């Protein structure tokens, strides 16, 4: 099989479980980050300067790219006989692909809020600390898919904000309800399928959860998500809370 199609399992068998195709913040990783940033900033500027009709087309186009990107991985793994339950689109970022689709169709504020508060920091962390490097090289379906889909997941809510949407700290309870309401069934699904969606059943292979494990131990690493989520929400809403106070004073 050509290296381009090889899954994590085949890579582990051929290269060893500790193999990584490129180092964090090495040349390849920095180039991926630079290209992603240029793409997001360029698209956001285009969106902001566009008419309502063009904005709608851009949003639909980004949604279509997200769905095609997700489908490409699923088909690639299935057609090469490498598909397993772990490729179900049930990580938080995968689920956000469908939240993007639902928002594009229905234009719901709760979707926009969840995408702003959870999707932006989650997808950004994934790009900054990728957990998909145990593949043969950067030129593989898994790596290209992972980088592109997370860049698109950052872009979509950035477009919403660039188009005038204003997040509100008052909607944080809705965001938390979505997060914990989806995590609970995922936790039990992981138990039955032997998967690791939301990184709730195995801390290893991901830099963030590995850090939680180093601090809290393997048994309690999940508790690390609580302060991490609180910090992410604080940082995401701080600018809007400060802006709201300025307007009240004025």
Regions found by a protein language model. Give the residues of each.
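Aromatic-anchored segments of alpha-helical transmembrane domains
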Residues: 65-75, 119-131, 179-190
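Structural signature of hydrophobic alpha-helical transmembrane segments
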Residues: 29-35, 81-93, 116
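Membrane-interface helix-boundary motifs at transmembrane edges
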Residues: 46-59, 105-113, 163-173
């Amino acid at each position: 099989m050509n290296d381009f199609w090889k899954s994590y399992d085949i890579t582990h068998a051929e290269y060893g479980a500790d193999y990584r195709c490129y180092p964090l913040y090495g040349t390849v990783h920095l180039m991926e980050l630079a290209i992603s940033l240029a793409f997001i900033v360029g698209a956001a500027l285009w969106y902001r300067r566009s008419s309502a009709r063009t904005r709608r087309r851009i949003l639909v186009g980004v949604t279509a790219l997200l769905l095609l990107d997700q489908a490409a991985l699923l088909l690639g793994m299935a057609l090469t006989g490498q598909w397993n339950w772990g490729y179900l689109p049930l990580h938080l970022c995968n689920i956000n692909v469908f939240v993007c689709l639902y928002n594009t169709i229905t234009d719901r504020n709760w979707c926009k809020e969840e995408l702003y508060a959870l999707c932006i920091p989650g997808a950004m962390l994934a790009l900054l600390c990728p957990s998909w490097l145990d593949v043969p090289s950067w030129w593989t379906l898994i790596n290209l898919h992972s980088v592109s889909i997370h860049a698109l997941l950052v872009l979509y809510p950035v477009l919403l904000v660039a188009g005038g949407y204003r997040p509100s700290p008052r909607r944080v309870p809705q965001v938390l309800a979505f997060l914990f309401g989806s995590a609970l069934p995922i936790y039990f699904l992981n138990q039955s399928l032997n998967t690791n969606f939301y990184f709730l059943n195995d801390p290893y292979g991901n830099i963030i959860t590995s850090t939680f494990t180093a601090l809290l131990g393997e048994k309690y690493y999940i508790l690390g998500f609580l302060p991490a989520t609180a910090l992410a929400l604080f940082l995401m809403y701080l600018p809007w809370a400060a802006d709201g106070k300025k307007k009240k004073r004025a």
